[in-house]
Amino acid sequence: MPGGGSQEYGVLCIQEYRKNSKVESSTRNNFMGLKDHLGHDLGHLYVESTDPQLSPAVPWSTVENPSMDTVNVGKDEKEASEENASSGDSEENTNSDHESEQLGSISVEPGLITKTHRQLCRSPCLEPHILKRNEILQDFKPEESQTTSKEAKKPPDVVREYQTKLEFALKLGYSEEQVQLVLNKLGTDALINDILGELVKLGNKSEADQTVSTINTITRETSSLESQRSESPMQEIVTDDGENLRPIVIDGSNVAMSHGNKEVFSCRGIKLAVDWFLERGHKDITVFVPAWRKEQSRPDALITDQEILRKLEKEKILVFTPSRRVQGRRVVCYDDRFIVKLAFESDGIIVSNDNYRDLANEKPEWKKFIDERLLMYSFVNDKFMPPDDPLGRHGPSLDNFLRKKPIVPEHKKQPCPYGKKCTYGHKCKYYHPERGSQPQRSVADELRAMSRNTAAKTANEGGLVKSNSVPCSTKADSTSDVKRGAPKRQSDPSIRTQVYQDLEEKLPTKNKLETRSVPSLVSIPATSTAKPQSTTSLSNGLPSGVHFPPQDQRPQGQYPSMMMATKNHGTPMPYEQYPKCDSPVDIGYYSMLNAYSNLSLSGPRSPERRFSLDTDYRISSVASDCSSEGSMSCGSSDSYVGYNDRSYVSSPDPQLEENLKCQHMHPHSRLNPQPFLQNFHDPLTRGQSYSHEEPKFHHKPPLPHLALHLPHSAVGARSSCPGDYPSPPSSAHSKAPHLGRSLVATRIDSISDSRLYDSSPSRQRKPYSRQEGLGSWERPGYGIDAYGYRQTYSLPDNSTQPCYEQFTFQSLPEQQEPAWRIPYCGMPQDPPRYQDNREKIYINLCNIFPPDLVRIVMKRNPHMTDAQQLAAAILVEKSQLGY
């Protein structure tokens, strides 16, 4: 019955293969062909298993056929050993045919049969179907190798396509991670255009979103990045704690009436608003409602859902403002004041559609608070909707508006779709986060802005400074930048006036109103920054610390400290040594024409304008001091110097003009007109010269080292015509030591026929030396003025500057009779051109003002030729006389 056993074995194997794997028809045929032969061989092999030494587990073929022919045992064992070797190839990984042959040869011996049989019984005897399965698997190996080779051919194509797409993206500047993100999202078969589109979208997303994403969650995150971006404010709202949210103060009446369409007091609207803020995480919410809203609803005051008010009151959210009835009349406290006051004190948000104009006008801080913290709203079908931009499109978002501190800086513009690859530059209207706070302007616009800033800075540091622009207590270092940036002094009036007009618009008009006059144009020396060195102390009432270096100690090109004069003040002092004063008088920079500015003619430039002052004008002038002691009074007038007609007097040497100073006018010069007739050095102040008020003086005792009368002849002469200017008679006081002289070289622009003015406020005296002969004219390196302090400037030599002529002032000894003199009491006649101008001005003013008034003012100011100043004086006179 071995044939039946083999058939059953074949059936079992086929059923097992049908369960475990697919068997092709060709494989099944091969298997059926091997079935009979293998079954016959196994039958012979199992016969020998009747040996009592063997395991009791034996197949059915051995039991049914106990007696078998043993002649072919060696042959059968050899075949079985070969089968065992084939099965051992799968189980024990032994593929050697030589070993199977050895087993066959050894199996002939009876002692070794048991060992071989044990090895064979370990697998084939107990599980015979495994042997055939292993053989069938070996038969499948060539087919599997074919399929694996086909599959191995496909990946190189996929890898090559992936590498191509990756290289293409890398050339465009994208990273490999971004390419992997896109390929995982779109798939490996995606077209290159689709990949590029996704890369562009992915490149515009913030780097923070990219770093958060990981490789494991690439597909999920890339598909939801846009939704996360749109929902990020809500996420931030959820993460906000109550500490970073502002308190909310709700105008209950306004919200309820708005929800009731201004007809019904709808308490449900208050509930909706409160719930909206509670959902956002706000904990500090207060609703103000007048107490009379708890009353029963009436036709004229409809109220709905009143139970909501009581519920919110129990939750300590709603507060009733006081209201009561007095003799049948309801007295209601102003609930809006409660709302604004609480919101202001708690730094919260007011929720209302009311503008609170009446309360905003009460306090400026309330107005500012209402403008910045008022949150308006709308109701859309029982939905409370505040605006996303409470303060307008350029203001903060609603989220940051309700926060104490903004969490994320908001981008006002939409991100640029091109990102870093945008080629629009500064013209791109989209937001570029990579540019940061860089100016969104072109290079040309930047250069224009820089040039405007430079021009404005140059104008502020220009060579002209308003006379009332610097306070009296200002130190020299405050204007060091101005001095440093000032150009060299120029005589061209157009350059000066252009800069000055810009400065004049920015300067206060306080002192203009005080002096009732027009400020004068003055120039700043550009190189007047040399600090005064310690030399001889002054003895003319200046502070003891004021010193001036002699010329030999000062390097060439360095100018002495600029002497400054305040408005309505006359004592010259260096800028660093100004005494401090409390008077609102400003320090200015005045040129040598301070006391002569009333001579500024609008038309001709007559060189005969040399006698600028008369006794009447002198007596009517005012000198006001900054303080009772140590103050500075200056004879600076506030009229313009007529630049347009080139009447400005400039010095050939820049050192001269800096050191020509106004002298202190003492009260005795006002009380006694004698010093003027004796050619005193006293400037005139015209601060209120148009007024009939008596001038106020701070009487000071005369300086002890100076005589009351220091007469000296003020003679301005040219070497060509010394006889044109007669000299006043000498005085007994002319022998006083150090009366002073100086050589002053001046010019009136390019006019060579220059004259000096009598009683010049900036005149310097040359001390007379008895060793000198009569008429000898020295030119020392420095001069001593009437008050005895040194003037550190040098006189230019004729050889170096031949176009300028020297003028000298000399105090002649009394025994010497001068060759020319001026009449003692008389004043020189005005030149014809001067009179012609006065006549023209008189005619023009008579066409505007009453002739009598014009005549009075022009008589009072005989040497004034400025029509504007005369008109101002006429207006003052007219107001005083009551015309």
From Swiss-Prot:
InterPro entries listed in its UniProt record: Rege-1_UBA-like, Regnase_1/ZC3H12_C, RNase_Zc3h12_NYN, ZC3H12/N4BP1_RNase_Reg, Znf_CCCH
Entries under PROSITE patterns matching the protein: ZF_C3H1 (PS50103)
CDD domains according to UniProt: PIN_Zc3h12-like
Enzyme Commission (EC) number: 3.1.-.-
Expression triggers: By cytokines (TNF-alpha and interleukin-1) in acute monocytic leukemia cell line THP-1 cells.
GO CC aspect terms: cytoplasmic ribonucleoprotein granule; nucleus
Polar residues bias locations: 466-477, 517-542
MF terms in GO: mRNA binding; RNA endonuclease activity; zinc ion binding
Zinc fingers classed as C3H1-type: ranges: 410-435
Segments forming domain RNase NYN: 245-400
Biased composition (Low complexity): 705-714
Modified residues (Phosphoserine): 230
Skewed-composition ranges (Basic and acidic residues): 503-515
Keyword annotations: Endonuclease, Hydrolase, Magnesium, Metal-binding, Nuclease, Phosphoprotein, Zinc, Zinc-finger
Cofactors (names): Mg(2+)
Enzyme class per UniProt: hydrolase
Ranges where the record places region Disordered: 53-109, 139-158, 456-551, 680-738, 754-775
Protein family: Belongs to the ZC3H12 family.
Role: May function as RNase and regulate the levels of target RNA species.
PANTHER family named among the record's database cross-references: N4BP1-RELATED, RIBONUCLEASE ZC3H12C-RELATED
Protein name: Probable ribonuclease ZC3H12C
Protein species of origin: Homo sapiens
